[in-house]
Regions:
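A short, surface-exposed alpha-helical micro-motif characterized by mixed small hydrophobic
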Residues: 26-28, 295-297
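Conserved ABC transporter NBD signature motif
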Residues: 146-154
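A short, proline-enriched helix->beta-strand linker immediately N-terminal to the Walker B motif
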Residues: 247-251
């Protein structure tokens, strides 16, 4: 898309105003750059000069916002999740001479992988490669074919009622922190909602105390629990979404592009938080993203997807040192 925009700009001799928080895109396509902070332009310059010699402290902070990298696991345990021959199909309906014709579109094709406790599997690929379909299939938000085993138990064919007991062990954090939190509920209600389903034996007081603790664990103040989502920034909302997943004490968390809607400095903070929580609680992550910088910081192993297929699956160091696929 960026190449197309740049091609059209040159062809029609038009100007292009690009608004983004992705500095990699800015560096690639922009001639001049304006940096904004709190509604004001704090620095503007030619792209090459701004990236080589930034002047304002906020610009320097953005450019230097590199997340710390995860320490690789040396001793691996038995797989916590095994996926074998996963296939996902979507019904695609078209009209041909006023007659409806249904065709199956295969989003995921014979995908298999294993992940051990405490590991992070990074899944990367272009839009439409099947990344999010994998995530949704694993928590049974969409139907799929194949088998997946959680701690050696085949959970792929369980009914919704049977799978409910596993939901607290496998949680998901979605991409958009603005859409994934109900605007009608307080943060207390949002974070503690899962407790009322999976831990009905807990009293209201116990739930409130647990919610306070988990909110503190993600770097927020428990005095914020009576507020509503619109009162928080994007980064704070994603911390709330993380707290909602953590409160059920899961073993596996699937993160579907959780940093893509955040600016560079906040991305780095969220990555650092996820790494700290993983070390503290021995969490296993499946992290889906198209941002290789974030994937590199978080992952132990990386799976590259294209058109629903795995085209490369290797340890992080090998993928970045000697990628096999173009």
């Amino acid at each position: 898309i960026l190449d197309l925009l740049d091609k059209l700009r040159k062809k029609y001799k038009m100007s292009l105003l690009l608004i983004t928080h992705d500095l990699g895109i800015v560096k690639k396509i922009a001639n001049r750059v304006c940096v904004m902070e709190k509604g004001k332009i704090v620095e503007q310059n030619d792209s090459s000069k701004l990236f080589s010699k930034p002047e304002h402290i906020y610009t320097k902070k953005l450019i230097n916002s590199e997340p710390r990298e995860k320490k690789l696991i040396k001793k691996k345990s038995d797989p916590i999740l095994s996926v074998k021959n996963l296939n996902v199909f979507y019904k695609k309906t078209s009209r041909f001479f006023l007659k409806k014709k249904s065709n199956d579109c295969q989003a995921v094709k014979n995908l298999s992988f294993e992940i051990s406790k405490g590991e992070t599997l990074g899944i990367v690929g272009e839009s439409g490669s099947g990344k999010s379909s994998v995530a949704q299939a694993l928590i049974k938000l969409i139907s799929s074919e194949g088998n997946f085993f959680f701690k050696n138990k085949n959970i792929s064919n369980l009914s919704d009622k049977e799978f409910r007991s596993y939901r607290k062990n496998i949680q998901i954090i979605f991409q958009d922190p603005f859409a994934s939190l109900s605007p009608r509920l307080t943060i207390q209600d949002i974070v503690s909602e899962g407790l009322e389903v999976h831990y009905k034996e807990k009293t209201k007081k116990e739930m409130k105390e647990l919610t306070k603790k988990i909110i503190n664990d993600v770097g927020l103040d428990s005095t914020m629990l009576s507020r509503y989502p619109h009162e928080f920034s994007g980064g704070q909302r994603q911390r709330i979404a993380i707290a909602r997943a953590l409160i059920l004490n899961p073993e596996l968390i699937i993160l579907d592009e959780p940093t893509s809607a955040l600016d560079m400095t906040v991305q780095s903070q969220i990555v650092d938080l996820l790494l700290s929580l993983q070390e503290e609680k021995q969490l296993t992550y499946i992290f889906i993203s198209h941002d290789l910088k974030i994937i590199r910081a978080l992952s132990d192993k990386i799976m590259v997807m294209k058109s629903g297929k795995v085209i490369e699956f290797e340890e992080k160091k090998k993928i970045f040192a000697k990628p096999k696929n173009e």
